């Protein structure tokens, strides 16, 4: 439903009438949701490299569980990586909302259109801004 709600902000659908538009949007949203679900294993693997990078780079990190549960960068990167996949699927609005949720919680602002490679972390990230045109580690 959320993907479909986001698609409603896209003005590219030129269906003949409202019923056709709704059906068209629903079919597109289902296809996008399926594509995202198929990408989840790769997304999980990428996030695990981010967790490992945070652990390896921080001598204060006691264990991976602490990194996952307590490090704001992991929250920001998790939201970014999901939002980025939605950007790649041309979903409007929803990726920015997901990124803003992490920004308000962590102080780390990562635009979902930015390109960030694997094994990435941000230590003490409050105030960090990564813009839409930024390419890191690619």
Regions of interest found by a model, annotated:
Residues 1-100:
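Terminal amphipathic alpha-helical/low-complexity segments used for targeting or macromolecular assembly
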